């Protein structure tokens, strides 16, 4: 056997084996590898999309939280303003009531003072009349007394 013929036979067998493999074994193997690459790429793309969706959801949640805090702060400020307004209104009402009571009391005091002055004037006039009556030692009738007292009160 010739070594060259053996090598040539082995080369032909190898070429036939390679052709057979390229025709029948290689395409399904490559299809399987490409399918697996596609699945991996789709999985990575899906993971990337999920990460982006998560980032978007977190950003939206943060925005909603900030908006809720702003709204809560606005509600608190509005409540504080309303509280201050109610307190101011209550103070104003109390001040008005106090002024009303003071004015009423002052009016009562003035009326009482006026009545006391009138009473005092009448008593002073009666005392003066009694003193004058004792000095003169004569009796004046009650109608004349009343006229004299009224005149004296009017003069005082």
UniProtKB/Swiss-Prot annotation:
Q: How does it sit in the membrane?
A: Single-pass membrane protein
Secreted as a keyword of this entry, yes or no, is no
The record, for CDD domains, names:
ATP-synt_Fo_b
Alphabetically list the UniProt keywords.
ATP synthesis, Cell inner membrane, Cell membrane, CF(0), Hydrogen ion transport, Ion transport, Membrane, Transmembrane, Transmembrane helix, Transport
Q: Where in the cell is it found?
A: Cell inner membrane
TM spans (from-to): 11-31
PANTHER family to which the protein is assigned, alphabetical: ATP SYNTHASE SUBUNIT B, ATP SYNTHASE SUBUNIT B', CHLOROPLASTIC
Which proteins does it associate with, and in what oligomeric form? Answer: F-type ATPases have 2 components, F(1) - the catalytic core - and F(0) - the membrane proton channel. F(1) has five subunits: alpha(3), beta(3), gamma(1), delta(1), epsilon(1). F(0) has three main subunits: a(1), b(2) and c(10-14). The alpha and beta chains form an alternating ring which encloses part of the gamma chain. F(1) is attached to F(0) by a central stalk formed by the gamma and epsilon chains, while a peripheral stalk is formed by the delta and b chains.
The UniProt entry's sequence similarity note says:
Belongs to the ATPase B chain family.
Protein name listed in UniProt: ATP synthase subunit b
What is the species listed in this Swiss-Prot or TrEMBL entry? Answer: Sodalis glossinidius (strain morsitans)
């Amino acid at each position: 056997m010739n070594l060259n013929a053996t090598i040539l036979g082995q080369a032909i067998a190898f070429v036939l084996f390679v052709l057979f493999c390229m025709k029948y074994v290689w395409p399904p193997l490559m299809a399987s590898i490409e399918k697996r690459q596609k699945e991996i790429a789709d999985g990575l793309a899906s993971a990337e999309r999920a990460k982006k969706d998560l980032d978007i959801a977190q950003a939206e949640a943060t925005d909603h939280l900030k908006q809720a805090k702003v709204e809560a702060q606005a509600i608190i400020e509005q409540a504080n303003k309303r509280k201050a307004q109610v307190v101011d209104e209550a103070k104003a009402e109390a001040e008005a009531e106090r002024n009303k009571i003071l004015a009423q009391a002052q009016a009562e005091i003035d009326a009482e003072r006026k009545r006391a002055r009138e009473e005092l004037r009448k008593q002073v006039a009666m005392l003066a009349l009694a003193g004058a009556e004792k000095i003169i030692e004569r009796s004046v009738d009650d109608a004349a007394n009343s006229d004299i007292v009224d005149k004296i009160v009017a003069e005082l």
